[in-house]
A protein has these predicted regions:
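Helix-start (N-cap) detector for alpha-helical repeat units in TPR-like alpha-solenoids
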Residues: 42, 77, 111, 116, ...
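Helix-turn-helix repeat elements of alpha-solenoid scaffolds
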Residues: 50-65, 89-102, 128-140, 166-170, ...
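Structural marker of alpha-solenoid helical repeat scaffolds
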Residues: 70-72, 106, 110, 145, ...
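Canonical tetratricopeptide repeat
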Residues: 82, 121, 155, 159, ...
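Residue-level recognition of tetratricopeptide repeat
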Residues: 49-50, 85, 124, 162, ...
Length: 280
């Protein structure tokens, strides 16, 4: 039988403290969404830019460049936000960060919700570009703005926690995760990443408690099941780990999480040489 210590973690995207996609559904619903009160022509153009970037980023990039060149003063903010989004789609993280940061800098006064969103986007771009120090500056600036509610603040605190982990500031990250849990208690990702952080900090008791909350909030999330299995096997509960990883393969058989779950299961139950020979 494989012992917990002998299982080599094969990290999945959810288990790594890598930046989330800038416009993943979770991020869009909170701090990095594009908030419109009463939509304007510029708002509609920004939405069209986001949609075009998904299908034809090259054309979207050209259109964004023209829009930025035509605008003046605070009117450049939304064109720059469009440009930042296109750069993010193209994985040009430094350029995306610069565009979002400039969009925040020239934004009109009196729109703190939008400023919070754009600063969050700048922070996520910096984090994706492996600049957690710059990301933290953007997130801290965003948190100084009226955020539109605790859920948005919770998302920013989660992003801030990821930056702090990348900077090796474990105590500060712990505080940021706690703030995210307080402000966004219904967000599964808050609990998932908190559990991962606790597990990596060798606090399996806390990790188990946190992953149970994530599982209750999102029982069919394959990344939650993957992390639950890792926590279980490290705690000596091999049967529970196997059950979690098998469920991941059933729930999302073609996903990256399912591939990782299979690798974990193979470590628990390695193929025997005689069975390999018989399969030839």
């Amino acid at each position: 039988m494989t012992t917990p210590e002998s299982v080599t973690p094969v990290e999945s995207p959810a288990q790594l403290f890598l930046p989330l996609p800038l416009f993943a559904p979770i991020a869009v619903s909170a701090a990095t969404e594009i908030p419109f009160a009463v939509p304007t022509v510029e708002d509609d153009r920004l939405r069209a830019c986001v949609e075009q970037a998904a299908s034809d980023p090259a054309s979207a990039l050209a259109e964004a460049g023209k829009w930025v060149a035509q605008a003046r003063g605070s009117a450049r903010s939304k064109p720059l936000q469009c440009l930042g989004h296109v750069h993010a789609v193209l994985l040009r993280w430094d350029a995306a960060e610069a565009a979002f940061a400039e969009a925040a800098a020239v934004a009109a006064a009196g729109d703190p919700l939008r400023l919070t969103a754009v600063l969050g986007q700048a922070g996520n771009a910096a984090l994706a570009g492996d600049h957690p120090d710059r990301a933290l500056i953007h997130f801290d600036a965003a948190l100084k703005q009226p955020s539109g509610g605790p859920a948005a603040r919770g998302q920013l605190q989660l992003d801030r926690a990821r930056a702090l982990v990348a900077l090796g500031r474990a105590d500060d990250a712990t505080a940021a995760f706690a703030a995210a849990q307080r402000d966004a208690p219904e967000e599964p990702l808050v609990w998932l990443l908190s559990a991962t952080f606790a597990r990596r900090s060798n606090d399996l008791t806390a990790a188990q408690r946190l992953i149970e909350v994530a599982s209750n909030l999102s029982p069919i999330d394959p990344d939650v099941g993957l992390e639950a299995g890792v926590i279980a096997v490290l705690g000596g509960r091999e049967a529970a780990a196997r059950q979690s990883w098998q469920s991941v393969r059933r729930i999302a058989p073609t996903s990256k999480a399912a591939e990782t779950a299979r690798a974990y299961l193979d470590q628990l139950d390695p193929p025997r040489p005689d069975s390999a020979e018989s399969g030839r």
